[in-house]
């Protein structure tokens, strides 16, 4: 059920320049609650974003009859994520310690820890103890904030 909700919600979110970051259906409440978390990659996610998404997604879910019984739809922001996914994240957290994980070993390592210095079309750049590191974006599985550089 949740994968279908995400499949329906993603194009709705894209219309408003939003991203769906998760969904959960809480059946322990009466009526059950469908919570969809969204994020605006261009600005802080605000109440207006949640309202627009709620109205538009409600219409899509009702039309598709995903939930035949009564439910409550909640749209919210997940808050600060440790994963860096959009350009805004890479600008906001420049200079912060990050952990970069790669699909395959890159130069013998699956993980790289250092201070984020930038990201462009081809590379994510780190400073690792004064040494610049460039990791090709196609090699990267994920980039996340890290507690402290090694």
Curated annotation (Swiss-Prot):
<dbReference type="GO" id="GO:0000028">
    <property type="term" value="P:ribosomal small subunit assembly"/>
</dbReference>
<dbReference type="InterPro" id="IPR003728">
    <property type="entry name" value="Ribosome_maturation_RimP"/>
</dbReference>
<comment type="similarity">
    <text>Belongs to the RimP family.</text>
</comment>
<keyword id="KW-0963">Cytoplasm</keyword>
<protein>
    <recommendedName>
        <fullName>Ribosome maturation factor RimP</fullName>
    </recommendedName>
</protein>
<dbReference type="InterPro" id="IPR028989">
    <property type="entry name" value="RimP_N"/>
</dbReference>
<comment type="function">
    <text>Required for maturation of 30S ribosomal subunits.</text>
</comment>
<dbReference type="GO" id="GO:0005829">
    <property type="term" value="C:cytosol"/>
</dbReference>
<dbReference type="InterPro" id="IPR036847">
    <property type="entry name" value="RimP_C_sf"/>
</dbReference>
<keyword id="KW-0690">Ribosome biogenesis</keyword>
<dbReference type="GO" id="GO:0006412">
    <property type="term" value="P:translation"/>
</dbReference>
<dbReference type="Pfam" id="PF02576">
    <property type="entry name" value="RimP_N"/>
</dbReference>
<dbReference type="InterPro" id="IPR035956">
    <property type="entry name" value="RimP_N_sf"/>
</dbReference>
